[in-house]
Amino acid sequence: MTGAMALARRGLALLALGALAGCARRGAAPQPRYMVGDPYRLGGVWSYPREDFGLVQTGLAAVAADRRAGRRMSNGEVHDPALLTAGHRTLQLPAILCVTNLENGLTLDVRVNDRGPPHPGRVVELSRRAADLLGIRPGGAAQVRIAVVAEASRALAAGLPDPETPRLDISAAPLGAVEREDLAPSPGAVPARGIRDARPLVRETAGPPTAAATTPQRLPERVTRGFAQPGRLFVEAATFGRRDLAQQQAAGIGGRAEAFGPRGRENFRVRIGPLTSVEQADLALERTLRAGVSEARIVVD
């Protein structure tokens, strides 16, 4: 009898230890990882992730919804709306992105750690805290310019492990394109309201760097004030090396073909616009996507 009781007690102890171990595993902090990932479909549009340490884009920024708080991000982290993070459809994860609100001149660095935005007409999705510092209201959309901070992004990538699962060849999904565009300063740029110069404004700065600086979970909340440079909204459908192909597409979607680049080596882009509001731009983008131009996007110029 005594032996049976001892065995029973030992079994209960082992079960308790196993349960504690399971709780420890479930409660363990997620480990961020470096990833590029496979082509995927979101919001009815295919996206093709790739490494790009020189990406510069313009477009409209969205603010992450409250319902995403606490969920697992694409690179293994748990979403925290209080951190300076963002989602991007194609960039390597993580990456450091310099985001400028063109409507008020405020600039802030964020860490890209997720895919998105779900809306195909948005170029980046900002955490609540990042959006607040940039003066972007939840539920709204703001004209932004985004640029990868190359050195910081490479250092971040070097300090993280690669994902365990192999990557699929991009040919497994329909062929798409990722556009890149540099935004030249607007000749009609005006100072942001209430701003007299372009000196850095530090609203709040995190503590001194730690040994984990190569994989920061919290970027400093350093906001820089510059000049407001709001532009005009366009839907950019595609880019071609031949004028006749661009004109053919433009005729099919009600746009126009524009030459750009150095003389003698011009390329031709198809655009619709300028569009007078975000709502009008969204409708034009929706029509263009329905016409089968899957790489179309909203840009600011």
Task: Please state what every model-predicted region is.
Residues 9-13:
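N-terminal export leaders
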Residues 67-186:
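Exported/periplasmic cell-wall-interacting domains
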Residues 1-6:
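N-terminal secretory signal peptides that target proteins for export/translocation
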Residues 160-232:
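Long, low-complexity, acidic/serine-threonine-proline-glutamine-glycine-rich intrinsically disordered tracts
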Residues 214-230, 239-301:
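Extracytoplasmic
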Residues 19-22:
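C-terminal motif of bacterial Sec signal peptides marking the signal peptidase cleavage site
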Residues 24-26:
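Bacterial signal peptide processing site
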Residues 28-60:
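Post-signal peptide N-terminal segment of mature Sec-exported envelope proteins
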